[in-house]
Structures are given as structure tokens and as C-alpha cells.
């Protein structure tokens, strides 16, 4: 199984111990360095962490940015959208979701973290089924949600 992630971190380590290949695209250089150090410390060899910096002030054309488009060259069974949160006045994850829907193969899944911010995507998608998982937020007060879209 192959996983593609917008964003990197704990999920990169989680998937790397469970699947054949993880490709993670990270936009923040400092975070990229921290995750890369953690992967090396744990001797992870099946994760490809790539740094693709982006200018979030130019968001109106963000869907054509190298960050979003990095998914185009990757085959994945699972696509995780978990990056660029609270980084811009624009909703960036829905742009990543739109491209992910064109790239996901039949039988694949898209995971959208912090989906409580993007509930409109639960009705506007081409998934066969959507499962919503709610739980107390580990890093914020209140309940958070993660949506899993099955194709």
C-alpha cells in the first residue's frame, strides 16, 4: 500500500511502520527538518519527505502551485490531507481535496483531518461512502473530526 500526505509529522511515522511507501509533501522548512530528523533517528527508509515551499500570500492561484500539484506524479492508495492549517486566510485543504479526488484510484481512500472546518465537502464529493470520526481534540479544546472518503 502507498500513502501520499499533504503535510508531515506523526502520521508520516505512523504510516511508515504500516505500509510499503509514504510520500509526504511539507511546505514549512523548520518542520520538514524536524520530521526528517525523526525519520532518520527511527531508521525509516520507506518514507520520502519532500520540501515544497509555497507563498501562501498568492493563494488565489494556489491550486496550480507546486505544493498542490506535487500529488500529480504520485500513485497512492491513501491520500491524507493534513497540512497548511491556519496558515492563510484562504481554505487551502479543499483545494488539495479537489485534486486528490481526481488522483485517487478506485478502492482508495482520502483522509481529511480537522474536517469540522470543511463539512461542505461531505456533500460535495465523488466518494462511494464517507465516514466521519469525532473525538476530543488532542491539541485544542473541544471536539475535532476526521473524515474518511472511500472511492
Listing of model-derived features with the role each one plays in the protein:
Residues 1-58:
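SAM cofactor-binding core of SAM-dependent methyltransferases
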Residues 5, 80-81:
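Redox-cofactor binding/interface segments in oxidoreductases and associated redox assembly factors
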Residues 12-16, 32, 36, 68, ...:
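Short amphipathic alpha-helical segments and helix-helix/interface helices
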Residues 54-62, 136-141:
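A short acidic, often aromatic-flanked loop/helix-cap motif at beta-alpha or helix-coil junctions
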Residues 58-65, 86-92:
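Short, flexible/disordered intra-domain loops and linkers
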Residues 60-68, 144-150:
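Short, surface-exposed amphipathic charged segments that create phosphate/polyanion-binding patches used
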Residues 69-78:
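A short acidic, Gly/Pro-enriched loop at the edge of an enzyme's catalytic core
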Residues 78, 84-151:
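C-terminal substrate-binding/active-site "lid" region of AdoMet-derived donor-dependent transferases
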Amino acid at each position: 500500500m502507498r500513502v501520499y500526505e499533504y503535510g508531515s509529522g506523526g502520521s508520516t511515522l505512523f504510516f511508515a511502520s504500516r505500509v510499503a511507501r509514504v510520500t509526504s509533501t511539507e511546505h514549512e522548512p523548520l518542520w520538514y527538518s524536524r520530521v526528517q530528523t525523526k525519520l532518520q533517528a527511527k531508521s525509516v527508509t520507506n518514507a520520502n519527505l519532500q520540501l515544497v515551499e509555497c507563498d501562501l500570500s498568492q493563494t488565489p492561484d494556489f491550486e496550480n502551485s507546486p505544493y498542490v500539484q506535487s500529488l500529480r506524479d504520485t500513485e497512492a492508495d491513501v491520500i491524507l490531507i493534513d497540512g497548511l492549517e491556519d496558515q492563510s486566510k484562504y481554505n487551502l485543504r479543499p483545494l488539495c481535496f479537489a485534486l486528490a479526488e481526481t488522483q485517487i484510484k478506485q478502492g482508495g481512500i482520502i483522509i481529511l483531518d480537522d474536517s469540522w472546518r470543511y463539512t461542505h465537502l461531505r456533500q460535495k464529493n465523488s466518494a462511494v461512502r464517507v465516514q466521519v470520526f469525532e473525538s476530543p481534540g488532542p491539541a485544542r479544546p473541544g471536539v475535532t473530526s476526521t473524515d474518511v472518503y472511500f472511492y
